[in-house]
From Swiss-Prot:
GO terms for molecular function: ATP binding; glutaminyl-tRNA synthase (glutamine-hydrolyzing) activity. The gene is gatA. Heterotrimer of A, B and C subunits. The lineage of its organism: Archaea, Thermoproteota, Thermoprotei, Desulfurococcales, Desulfurococcaceae. Keywords: ATP-binding, Ligase, Nucleotide-binding, Protein biosynthesis. Transmembrane segments: none annotated. It holds the Pfam family Amidase. PANTHER family: GLUTAMYL-TRNA(GLN) AMIDOTRANSFERASE SUBUNIT A, MITOCHONDRIAL (PTHR11895:SF7), TRANSAMIDASE (PTHR11895). This is Glutamyl-tRNA(Gln) amidotransferase subunit A. One of its GO terms (biological process) is translation. Allows the formation of correctly charged Gln-tRNA(Gln) through the transamidation of misacylated Glu-tRNA(Gln) in organisms which lack glutaminyl-tRNA synthetase. The reaction takes place in the presence of glutamine and ATP through an activated gamma-phospho-Glu-tRNA(Gln). It comes from the Archaea.
């Protein structure tokens, strides 16, 4: 274990003249050369000369006193977020080589504030996975233990942070796809309130659940990134015209200001190492003055996972219907439309995506829609109401994952075990609430993460609570190696 710059530390170092963007980008490139072949965190990388040119421009801006908020900060972007200067594949053979004609809104906002985008990070195909193993470009490995998964679907975003190839990253979170990688790579992932960040340019998996989400090596850093990318967008009708305020340690909460609600029945389903780390951390917080309350979630514990997957797979089946072999890189050769579509989808989609499409079509089919899909939407309202009631009085605290990082290949052949990895994280997506995951312990050389779920637009509150936990654990800024 070693330490790397947090974004805040890096910007302070630039400001003081202790380092400059050219030196920093050179260090990042050294980390890439050392780690990337083994980890496979990126699908595509920007050319080195382009990165050095961008670093030189950033250095000039710092010297002239014209630095923007992310000037010289190296950022990785998940490869389901559109970029006009690098391919956007969504981790799928279906989109291999596809370069969009536009940038996603979040990418435009990063570039306007001086971020240097190093490349597009690996992911489970179309963001459908919890381990990072379902990419057409090969699995991503966990830098903390190369025999284990880094979590998914934002696997590359977590992994590149964990070995020092970027200072911050963007992922997308549909049911925990930023928070699971954060838990498994000792990084911080923040899923914002639904609508706070524009989804324009995001290749969709499940529109009503997913959010583009920041990742970094500290809670302050994810808030800084969120400050840049958040806000309304005329190209996304679901976006809201609100912006968070950056939280700093000086204006943050004190332990005695914290109220945590713990769904004890849910936590008890986690592995012993995870459970011990979780209760050890919340116990220390209680010792510092935080208030703990053990609660039930009105049935959310039992129904959240099946409701989530029913809704997500139905939306996925609808979204992926557009890939019919006529518009994107993988095309069918038959002149008959249906044969062309079948051929292209057979070639272009991986096994997990095919499985989810079939299940999504099934729950939407005549005779089953009421029994499955409509029932799931009703359960979603019950879960949302229970969560809104709970976060009105406290932050919901759970482990970020019920298990330690599994070994590569351990869960791919058992969909039920694979999907159960999301049991804690789907609560925030079903209710549209913000949630943060951060490391609380390194156990046997592997990270363990904690999740906090807060009220709508409560990102600053979550960051303040995370600041306290980071002070307690001392794990902000750690990287593998």
């Amino acid at each position: 274990m070693r330490r790397a710059y947090t974004v805040k530390q890096l910007l302070e170092s630039y400001r003081a003249g202790d380092t400059d963007p050219v030196e920093h980008v050179s260090r990042v490139l050294d980390a890439l050369r050392r780690w990337e072949r083994d980890v496979n965190a990126f699908i595509s990388l920007e050319a080195e000369e382009v990165l050095i040119d961008a670093a030189e421009e950033a250095a000039r801006r710092w010297r002239r006193g014209e630095a923007r908020r992310l000037e010289g900060v190296v950022v990785g972007v998940k490869d389901n977020i559109s970029t006009s200067f690098l391919p956007t594949t969504a981790g799928s053979r279906m989109l291999d080589g596809y370069i969009p004609p536009f940038n996603a809104t979040v990418v435009e906002r990063l570039l306007m504030e001086g971020a240097i985008i190093i490349g597009k990070t690996n992911l489970d195909e179309f963001a459908m996975g919890s381990t990072g193993e379902f990419s057409a470009f090969g699995p991503t490995r966990n830098p903390w233990d190369l025999s284990r998964v880094p979590g998914g679907s934002s696997s590359g975003s977590g992994a590149c942070l964990a070995y020092g190839a970027c200072d911050a990253a963007l992922g997308s979170d549909t049911g925990g796809s930023v928070r699971l990688p954060a838990a498994y790579t000792a990084t911080v992932g923040l899923k914002p309130t639904y609508g706070l960040v524009s989804r324009y340019g995001l290749i969709p998996y499940a529109n009503s659940l997913e959010q583009i989400s920041p990742m970094a090596r500290s809670s302050e850093d994810v808030m800084l990134l969120l400050e840049v990318i958040a806000g309304g967008d005329e190209y996304d009708a679901t976006s809201i015209y609100s912006k968070p305020t950056t939280a700093s340690r000086e204006e943050g909460l004190k332990p005695e200001d914290l109220s945590l609600c713990i769904p004890e029945e849910l936590v008890e389903h986690s592995e012993e190492a995870v459970r011990k780390a979780f209760y050890n951390t919340v116990g220390k917080l209680e010792g510092l003055g935080a208030r703990l309350e053990y609660v039930g979630l009105g049935g959310a514990e039992a129904y959240a996972l099946p409701a989530y997957y029913t809704i997500a797979l139905a939306e996925a089946a609808s979204n992926l219907a557009r890939y019919d072999g006529s518009l994107y890189p993988v095309r069918g050769s038959s002149g008959d439309y249906w044969r062309q579509a079948a051929e292209a989808r057979g070639i272009g989609f991986g096994l997990e995506v095919k499985r989810r499409i079939l299940m999504g079509v099934y729950v939407l089919s005549e005779g089953y829609k009421d029994e499955y899909y409509l029932a799931a939407t009703k359960l979603r309202r019950v879960i949302r109401d229970a969560m809104l009631k709970t976060v009105g009085k406290c932050l919901v605290a759970t482990p970020a994952s019920p298990i330690m990082p599994p070994r590569i290949g351990e869960r791919v052949d058992d969909p039920l075990k694979l999907y159960a990895m999301d049991v804690y994280t789907v609560l925030a997506n079903l209710s549209g609430l913000p949630a943060i995951a951060l490391p609380i312990e390194i156990h046997g050389g592997l990270p363990v993460g904690l999740q906090l779920i807060g009220p709508r637009l409560g990102e600053r509150l979550l960051a303040g609570a995370a600041n306290i936990i980071e002070d307690l654990t001392g794990l902000a800024g750690v990287v593998a190696g």
